[in-house]
Amino acid sequence: MNRTLQNQVKENLCPDGIWRLNDPMKSILRRQISHLPKSKVTEDETRYPGRPASMREFLIKFFARHYLQIQNSLIEYITTQDFYNIIRLGHLRILDVGSGPAVASLAITDMLVCLIEHLKSEGIWPRGKRVKIDYILNDTSGICLGTGKRMLTGYYKISRRNNREVVLGQIIDVRRGFPDNLNQLQRVRFNLGKYDIATFSYVLSPLSEEKGFNNLVLGLFDVEKLCNYSGRILVLQDKYRAGLVYRISRAIGISNTFEESIQEIYPKRGLCDIYPYWYYCFLYIPTKKMMVRQNFVA
């Protein structure tokens, strides 16, 4: 895995430095939006959809934004030897906390498909080798979990003609909110193996408000113990929560970065097609951080 490969994969996903949904993902998104009713919803309902109409607005306003920010944040990791060491074993496990309609899971899956295409063209990927992906979707909203499952299965149906290397494993939904669901997450980890990527996309603020700051931090520590030694934990939060981001950064002992993602807006909403978004990101290796913390405590 080298810088040239990373540039090739990034150019495919982010041509000319602009992150875009590819045609299959646009098709899946349009289909889901078309099947949902249109009615007036509040801003909070749009951000945290609990019924079909608010899910429709979330898909229009936030899906592409969050999806492309996930890809922007993970592009370097998926072209590392650490990630290759995971996928060459034929199994990837994604824990998607605050999954919404499986936004992070879909973004990671599409990146993996793109990566393997480039590995095949370079003669690096073994012929006939497959990667099974298991998804653990965690959200308290039934409409989010149901929509996420439909979009994941729709992605595999569309991509099956050109993609034989990435196959759908299990989709497990966990309805109980984080961190009260840690016993469930531990049982899933025991049955499937350690999580390779754990994502927390735009959930720090609601989790801190609902469960309390200390419980959120302790939950993040507990998730680290469930993760693969070559895996990553990814946390994203919007630029308006700087105070919360820095508190969590100090509490878990990990620095955050302030990222820019230049994206194509989709579906188009009568605005400029291309827009820059700024957000906070944590991306870290859980096992190394645990070792550092344990050594410090000792």
How would you describe each model-predicted region?
Residues 1-41:
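N-terminal auxiliary segments of SAM/dcSAM-dependent transferases
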Residues 2-8, 142-298:
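Domain-level detector for long C-terminal conserved domains
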Residues 44-86:
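Class I SAM-dependent methyltransferase Rossmann-like catalytic core
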Residues 59-74, 100-108, 140-148, 212-215:
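Phosphate/oxyanion-binding active-site loops and adjacent basic polyanion-contact surfaces
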Residues 77, 81, 112-116, 152, ...:
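Active-site catalytic pocket residues across diverse enzymes, especially alpha/beta-hydrolases
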Residues 90-100:
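Conserved class I S-adenosyl-L-methionine
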Residues 101-123:
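Conserved SAM-binding loop of SAM-dependent methyltransferases across substrates and taxa
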Residues 134-139:
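Conserved SAM-binding motif I beta-strand of class I
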